[in-house]
């Protein structure tokens, strides 16, 4: 994946192997860094929540039940499944059944003519036999 893969941390190599197992042979190095950041942030959040649950029950050590509870609370907030296809189809049919409004000509912003535009190209095509002098800017 990356040219300096031998210098990468162990977790980056693990993510690289996971990507390869999914059929992704090449990617930008930023992809692996972003996945590492997500994994570290998600793991840290889960462990902090598990510690809060353990403290709430009066324990100083985190148990597997604390981690499971923390994971269950995270899944509902972070990994929301998309709505069913049939539901999206019904909504799109309802929205698309209304015709688009045609704006009034009075309420539109009028664009100035191209001759007065600042970015207009100002050029003339001169014939070889023309007596007009060429202007050079």
Curated annotation (Swiss-Prot):
Pfam family, one: TFIID-31kDa
Primary location recorded for the protein, binned into one broad class: nucleus
Gene3D superfamilies linked to this entry: Histone, subunit A
Keyword Nucleus: yes
Protein localization: Nucleus
Alphabetically ordered keywords of this record: Nucleus, Transcription, Transcription regulation
GO molecular function: protein heterodimerization activity; RNA polymerase II general transcription initiation factor activity; transcription coactivator activity
SUPFAM superfamilies noted in UniProt: Histone-fold
Lineage: superkingdom: Eukaryota
GO CC term (a single one): transcription factor TFIID complex
Domain Histone-fold: from-to ranges: 9-71
GO biological process, one term: RNA polymerase II preinitiation complex assembly
Listed PANTHER family: TAF9 RNA POLYMERASE II, TATA BOX-BINDING PROTEIN (TBP)-ASSOCIATED FACTOR, TATA-BOX BINDING PROTEIN ASSOCIATED FACTOR 9
Function: Functions as a component of the DNA-binding general transcription factor complex TFIID. May also function as a component of transcription regulatory histone acetyl transferase (HAT) complexes such as SAGA. Binding of TFIID to a promoter (with or without TATA element) is the initial step in preinitiation complex (PIC) formation.
Similarity comment: family membership: Belongs to the TAF9 family.
Quaternary structure annotation from Swiss-Prot or TrEMBL: Component of the DNA-binding general transcription factor complex TFIID. Component of histone acetyl transferase (HAT) complexes such as SAGA.
Protein known as: Transcription initiation factor TFIID subunit 9
Organism: Encephalitozoon cuniculi (strain GB-M1) (Microsporidian parasite)
Gene of this entry: TAF9
């Amino acid at each position: 994946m990356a040219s300096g893969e031998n210098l990468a941390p162990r977790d980056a190599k693990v993510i690289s192997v996971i990507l390869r197992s999914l059929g992704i042979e090449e990617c930008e190095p930023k992809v692996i860094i972003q996945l590492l950041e997500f994994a570290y942030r998600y793991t840290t959040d889960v462990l902090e929540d598990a510690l809060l649950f353990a403290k709430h029950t009066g324990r100083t050590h985190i148990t597997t039940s604390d981690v499971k509870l923390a994971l269950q609370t995270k899944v509902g907030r972070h990994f929301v499944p998309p709505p069913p296809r049939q539901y999206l189809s019904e909504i799109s049919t309802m929205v698309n059944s209304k015709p688009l409004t045609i704006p009034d000509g009075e309420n539109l912003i009028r664009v100035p003519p191209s001759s007065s535009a600042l970015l207009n190209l100002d050029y003339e095509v001169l014939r070889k036999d023309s007596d007009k002098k060429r202007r050079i800017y």
